[in-house]
Every structure is written in structure tokens, then in C-alpha cells.
């Protein structure tokens, strides 16, 4: 009896069918700089160097983490791709880079073209929101490697910034103002803790009055906000001195990454409203306050540091983009050594 690749668990025909299903989603994301079509060995992108004096390429890679477990349980797969793009492009945008193109890696134990197409539909939507092109990716069918119906995602984004316009935090000074920009919810961090706190007690279809009648699945799968275009628009109007994308490690772990040594950011938690989902996690899981702040974004997905004289202009620019933002603290002199961030009551 002859043995085929399909007998071993890899269905080439299903993979080809997936490629056909995702092309209509990926094609609208392509920018004029993209050369060739979808499905080649490598994605080609002709950088328009005339737009820059000293072009610097910026790259970022990330995943979605155990938020995917919620998607599996809810059988919703069309938004985690947005999360994937957000986690990558937000990281490169905070240094001032315009996201140019994106590639994804989708791995599963048993390929379903329909499920994979839903995932890539979300990735394409994330690319649309970020203004970058989905120029390639990899689909891996790995029999026996994942539970049935499960998959993992990884993304890779490349952008470009003019060297004189890199935002690296070196100009941050004592007295500068810290502005927090609203998150859409948990984003894509802390889901192992959130799932333990909530899903060990409630089903995904449980509706909390505090969530406005939304189900837990709705709240937990709310896509990560993509700030890339907002960051670039703000930089056109205000000389922002530093940005921080608030991901794993929360405010205390991420704000110092963009501050000079010998400084500290002091944030006052009463200055911004905290979305209800964080209160639910804290209460239902009896999670200590410090653990909440070092795990979750706590309602601020992006932080900007500006000079006091630019505070009003920054708020006006963010309002014009439809973003909620608050002055949440200031930069102070710190002790010797690395920068720190403290959230005070």
C-alpha cells in the first residue's frame, strides 16, 4: 500500500485552497511600492528613498499569546489577526517609523482553509488600519503538534523612519508631561492571568451588567488598538519626545524602556478611567494591585512624553483623531541607574 503526504497528515490541496481564499483579503492591502503578486518566494518592496534624507529600516515581530485560546473556545477567528498586526506595528511606530509591509506565520495541526482564511482576513484588516502591505506569509501544517482546531500566529513588520526623526527618548527631561492614550481593553497581554481569573468561574457567553450586557467573549476578544497612523499624525504636529507601547510588563515595565537613565515617570492612577474588564479580573481573581499593573495595560495602550509647552497641542491632535487621552503624570529626576516608572494612588 502506497503512502501519501495526506496520509501523514499534510494536505497540500487544502493549503492551495487556503491561498486562493486569502488572496482577495491580501490584495487590497498592497501599496504602490509592492512589486509582483501574492505567492512568490519572497515579497518585493521598492522603498521610495526620495521620501527620506537618511532612511532607517525598523523591524518588529510578535505574536498574540494565549488570547488565541479564547478565540478557539469561542470559535471566532476573524479578529486575532488584527491583534497580530497591532502587536508588531505599534512597536515600530513608537520610534517614529511608518509601517510598510507585514508577513505572517500561521501554524496548525490540521489545516482548515476556512478557518485560516478567517485569520488572514483579520490580518489584512489590521494591515489596512496600519497602512502597511501584507506581502507574504507562511502556512505550516504540523500533524500532532497542536490540538485539533488550534493554531499559533507570529507576525513580522518592517517600517522606515528618517534618521533625524527617530523618537528614542533621549530628549526627555525632568518636568515633561506624560500623556496616556486609551486602550481598547486587554489588548493581547496578560491572557493567561485573565483566563484563570474569569474563565475558571464563568462561561464565555456569560453577560456582565458591568460590561453593558456584552459577553465575556466579546470583551476578551476586543481587538488590540492599532496606533500607527495616530502616532505618525501626532508627530506631524507635536515634537513628541518619547512613546511607549504598553504591552507585557504593563506601565512599570514599558514606560522606562523609552526614558533616559536617571529619570522616573510618576503616574497618578486617578487621572484616567480604568475599563471595567480590568476591575473584573482584579475582583474575580483577587489579583493584587501591583500584579495588575505589571501584567496589563490598565486602560492605557500607548504613552507619549511631551514638553509642558506641547501638552495642549498634543491633546488637541489626539482629540482630532478621535482618541481618548489624559495627562497622567510627569517625568521626575530619578536615582542613579536605569529609568523607572511608578504608578501612585
Curated annotation (Swiss-Prot):
GO terms for biological process: 'de novo' IMP biosynthetic process; adenine biosynthetic process. InterPro entries: PurM-like_C_dom (IPR010918), PurM-like_C_sf (IPR036676), PurM-like_N (IPR016188), PurM-like_N_sf (IPR036921), PurM_cligase (IPR004733). GO terms for cellular component: cytosol. Pathway: Purine metabolism; IMP biosynthesis via de novo pathway; 5-amino-1-(5-phospho-D-ribosyl)imidazole from N(2)-formyl-N(1)-(5-phospho-D-ribosyl)glycinamide: step 2/2. GO terms for molecular function: ATP binding; phosphoribosylamine-glycine ligase activity; phosphoribosylformylglycinamidine cyclo-ligase activity. It is found in: Cytoplasm. The keyword Nucleotide-binding applies. It catalyses: 2-formamido-N(1)-(5-O-phospho-beta-D-ribosyl)acetamidine + ATP = 5-amino-1-(5-phospho-beta-D-ribosyl)imidazole + ADP + phosphate + H(+). Belongs to the AIR synthase family. This is Phosphoribosylformylglycinamidine cyclo-ligase. It comes from Anaeromyxobacter sp. (strain K). The gene is purM.
